């Protein structure tokens, strides 16, 4: 499968300073701007319809569509506690959402390929979407290493799991609108 990166100013600066990370970002099937500075710059560069896309907003939209279409979802990342809460909250909010698996990998200082058993397990569940919640840059590196090995579209959503599990509250809409979400955190 391919992967989608949702990039913000921080990850854009990281890509500017690290050629390997830049190549990982550039290799993505799609890069979405999470932040008004990036979406504004995109519009100035000719992408007239560019809008800010956050991980949680994208998740919500895809979950709604998935309830109608029956798409299957696998969640990889975060902690077991967060995944447990995420499972409960998603079933409450999206009762028809087809969650086919969740896995909390051991926290390691470096990103390495998961063993063949885990890859086969994920692929056997036949996911349409594989949500990756490892945080940047770890999730982008992980997705790049697994491109073509996993079936389904991988989407790195950082703390998206925490928001949907009600572990972290999102900033009020007015703060999001004026690019002040960082201040709320």
Where in this protein do the model-derived segments appear?
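A short helix->loop->beta-strand "cap" motif at the edges of active sites that frequently abuts
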Residues: 71, 150-152
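Conserved beta-alpha
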Residues: 39-121, 125
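Short, flexible loop segments at boundaries between secondary-structure elements
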Residues: 104-110, 152-185
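Short glycine-rich anion-binding loops that position phosphate/pyrophosphate groups of nucleotides
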Residues: 9-12, 134-139, 160
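Short gly/pro/ser/thr-enriched loop/turn and capping motifs at secondary-structure boundaries
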Residues: 38-40, 138, 160-165
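N-terminal nucleotide/polyanion-binding subdomain common to many enzyme families
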Residues: 1-57
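Short Gly/Thr/Asp-enriched flexible loops that form oxyanion-binding sites at enzyme active sites
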Residues: 87, 140-149
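Proline-aspartate-enriched helix->loop->beta-strand connector
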Residues: 122-136
């Amino acid at each position: 499968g391919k992967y989608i990166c949702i990039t913000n100013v921080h990850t854009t600066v990281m890509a500017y300073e690290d050629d390997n990370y830049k190549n990982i970002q550039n290799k993505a099937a799609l890069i979405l701007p999470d932040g008004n500075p990036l979406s504004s710059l995109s519009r100035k560069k000719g992408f007239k319809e560019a809008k800010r896309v956050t991980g949680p907003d994208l998740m919500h939209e895809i979950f709604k569509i998935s309830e109608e279409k029956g798409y299957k979802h696998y969640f990889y990342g975060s902690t077991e506690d967060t995944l447990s809460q995420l499972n409960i909250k998603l079933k409450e909010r999206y009762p028809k959402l087809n969650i086919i698996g969740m896995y909390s990998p051991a926290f390691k200082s470096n990103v390495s390929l998961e063993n063949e058993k885990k890859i086969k397990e994920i692929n056997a569940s036949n996911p349409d979407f594989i949500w990756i919640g490892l945080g940047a840059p770890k999730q982008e590196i992980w997705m790049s290493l697994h491109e073509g090995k996993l079936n389904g579209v991988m989407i790195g959503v950082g703390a998206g799991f925490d928001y949907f599990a009600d572990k972290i509250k999102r900033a009020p809409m007015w703060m999001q609108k004026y690019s002040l979400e960082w201040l709320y955190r």
